[in-house]
Amino acid sequence: MNDRTIFRVMDKETTDTIHPDERKSVYLLPRRIVWKQGRISNEEVLLKERESQISLAAWDDCVMDSTDGQASLLLDFGNEIHGGIRILAWKDSTDRGARVRIRFGESVMEAMSEPGGEGNATNDHARRDIRTEIGMMSMNRIGETGFRFVRIDLEEENASLSLKSIAAVLVYKDAPYLGSFSCSDPLLNRIWDVGAYTVHLNMQEYIWDGIKRDRLVWVGDMHPETLTIRTVFGADASVARSLEFIRKETPLPGWMNGMASYTMWYAIIVHDWFMYTGYLEWLRSQEEYLEGISRQLSECIDEKGKDTVTEGRFLDWPSSDRPDVVDAGVQAIHLLAADSLRKLFM
């Protein structure tokens, strides 16, 4: 057998289904303990760098004890990231796994809040409020969302939990920053960096609308993201992969994401991406679909050049209750899409 990889013990039927994950992950220590409640000892050890491997004997451990009520702490990891946490626990007093509650938040308020109700945090899609059990000599990853702060509650009554470390797990695509921005204003430089970083977090295998939201490929929202990607990261494969995905998921005469305006955005993005990359073979692979949406959109223009789309007339959420604004916006997007298609077929 010539295969020298881990897959050498698997049969071909299994290896044919392998989908590699091109993303990387790194561990980050908490920067500070924002708040604690109840009986918790030696919590400062959680801020120290230690071997990321659990051992048999506990030493210099952080102990959460719920004998006199729930024990809780709130950690700050310093920056918003995409991923979860990894808890290394030496032992729990239940011998079956102590019940804990873990809440992720972009802010202290979100991590401390209950889900639901007016003004409170949600717990939709990428779950940020999780109940689980932590057992002895364990080192498990928990959660996959966007966060900076994490609150951990020991909900098991009359129990104790011995912890070695709690690290954040940053999951990201290792894409080099090819573009840059610099000016005399440090704040403006920081704003540019944070904007690029925010888009980078959403460049996973596909381009997501938000790391802590529904994680769908919203092709209309992809337009500003694609502009940022080509400026900062160049011709990243996540753009073409996302466009391929949404095309395959939307057989004609369907509208992408259920909205005619998002199909228009698809045509605009394909044109702009081809003009930037020059990937002719990729463009040819889209040709049949582009011809189809060109015919479909052309049927939604009256003799005066007015857009007549009746389904999926969406511009953005702030204008969604303003029909006059939506009409003007969709008319403009339709014009841009028609012009993009015209240029592609010239």
Give the positions of each predicted feature.
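Alpha-helix capping and helix-loop boundary segments enriched in small/acidic/polar residues
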Residues: 138-141, 182-186, 213-216, 230, ...
